[in-house]
Design a protein with these regions (language model features):
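Bacterial N-terminal signal peptides
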Residues: 18-29
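Short, solvent-exposed loop/beta-turn-alpha elements that line the ligand-binding surface or hinge
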Residues: 150-161, 251, 256-259, 338-351
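Pocket-lining segment of extracytoplasmic ligand-binding domains
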Residues: 202-205, 211-315
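Secondary-structure end/capping motifs
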Residues: 280-375
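Conserved C-terminal helix/tail region of periplasmic/extracytoplasmic solute-binding proteins
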Residues: 358-442
Length: 442
């Protein structure tokens, strides 16, 4: 009995070779389409000047840089671009234990996320994508009970010690001791690197942040590495010693693409189901525009964090006011503005350039057997670049139209469209700014 491939090879005449060639061409086209289907596919702007309404099944995780979206919700900025949330009014309170499942099965379309947490799903599926970055996470830190009165990495550096010598001296008191860390896999690379490089040989005990915080406040822990920045901030405010953090490693450790520090760099953002993204491309652009509007607004007016604090406290186990949230953001995960996103997508020499960071993360996950080796590339996961670049392109096109409109005498209805376009432009909704400016110019 012939195999399928033998059957393909059997014909000898011209017709047979034509069939074979056609089959191979068809296979190539299908392969190209399959490849294209696993990338962000931009949509054309909608006709007309109205913004179509959209409801997003959205979830937030219990961290300061994962709940700032609540500011835009309370201010009505998502409503301005036609977006509402399911469940109303603020979406779902999610956590790291259920977020990937909720995204995969379609119970959520979009989630605030540390995107490497989605990578383990690539062993079986390639549905979850990182559609944007919001901040560089600097909260990975080894904190010590203040009663121990230990010297920090920064102090050893100030004394003149080199990187590895300072790290060994800092963590020497941890030799044979226990570090209480969070369950998230994203923390393991940081913990493993400092343990190996310092030679401390500490043991890891995994515990949820909320439980760890209770024990720390009771003085029943000596060394902790919480996942959540609000927990890190709360303990630092309570006097816990920041022995060494990820910022120290980035600043003083070895640099370059092959640096062992590269897999430790954490960039927080948004995860989404690719089926939703490529069926609602313009909704994604509008959502992201509000994200950058919030970031810009909080930098100009930090009192906006008062809107976020109660929501964050309600499921993070913290007791922060607006100033506490502001300090958490500024110290542990400063937000990235729209224009500063070029460091992720355009600046190949940047420490946080997505291809460098994600190549290192993927390599680390492969080494741990979490995902298959050689099957996944950064562009398979990170779709934020094409999305950001599309908004940059809409801004450029809108600038050109606005320049054209300045030299025109407009009817009142056209002038109203031009004025509204400026409002959308100021709120980073360059898609609708372009649509309205185009309508005004015609």
């Amino acid at each position: 009995m012939k195999t399928f491939l033998q059957g393909l090879a059997a014909p000898r005449g011209r017709t047979g070779f034509q069939v074979l060639a056609a089959g191979l061409i068809g296979l190539t086209v299908l392969t190209q389409r399959a490849s294209a289907a696993d990338r962000f596919l931009p949509a054309a702007p909608e006709a007309g000047v109205e913004i179509p309404p959209a409801t997003i099944k959205f979830g937030m995780r219990p961290y300061a840089d994962n709940t700032f979206y609540i500011i835009g919700m309370k201010k009505g900025w998502f409503t301005d671009v036609g977006i509402s949330f399911d469940p109303a009014p603020y979406g779902l309170k999610a956590n790291d234990s259920n977020v990937t499942t909720l995204l995969l099965n379609g119970q959520l379309d979009l989630i605030s996320e540390f995107c490497p947490l989605m990578l383990p799903t690539y062993k079986d599926a390639a549905k979850l994508k990182c559609i944007g970055f919001t901040d560089n996470f600097l909260a990975n830190a080894i904190l010590a009970n203040p009663a121990l009165k230990l010297k920090t990495f920064k102090e050893y550096i100030a004394d003149g010690l080199g990187f590895e010598a300072a790290l060994k001296a800092t963590l020497a008191p941890m030799k044979g001791k226990t570090l209480v860390g969070a369950p998230q896999l994203s923390d393991r690379a940081f913990e493993e690197y400092i343990n190996k490089t310092s030679g401390a040989g500490f043991k890891l005990e995994v515990l949820d942040d909320a439980k760890s915080l209770v024990l720390a406040k009771a003085g029943r822990e000596d060394f902790v590495n919480p996942e959540g920045a609000p927990i890190v901030y709360t303990l630092r405010q309570a006097g816990w010693t920041n022995l060494v953090d990820i910022g120290d490693l980035i600043k003083y450790g070895p640099g370059g693409v092959e640096s062992p520090i590269e897999p430790l760099i954490g960039i927080v953002g948004l995860g989404a189901n690719s089926d939703y993204v490529n069926a609602h491309q313009n909704t994604i652009l509008r959502f992201m525009s509000v994200v950058w509007r919030i970031i810009d607004a909080t930098k100009a007016d930090p009192s906006l964090y008062e809107l976020q604090a109660p929501y964050l406290n309600s499921f993070a186990g913290t007791n922060l006011d607006g100033k506490g949230v502001e300090a958490t953001v500024n110290i542990l995960h400063p937000f990235t503005t729209f224009d500063a996103n070029k460091q992720y997508y355009d600046d190949k020499a940047s420490t946080v350039y997505y291809a460098n960071v994600w190549s290192a993360i993927i390599k680390d996950f492969e080494a741990h057997g979490i995902i298959p080796a050689g099957k996944i590339a950064p562009d398979d996961v990170v779709w934020g670049g094409p999305i950001w670049h599309q908004l940059v392109d809409y801004r450029t096109k809108t600038d050109e139209l606005m320049t054209k409109l300045k030299g025109m005498t407009l009817a009142s209805d056209k002038q109203a469209l031009a004025d509204k376009a400026k409002i959308f432009y100021a709120g980073y909704d360059f898609l609708d700014a372009y649509r309205l400016a185009l309508a005004a110019s015609n």
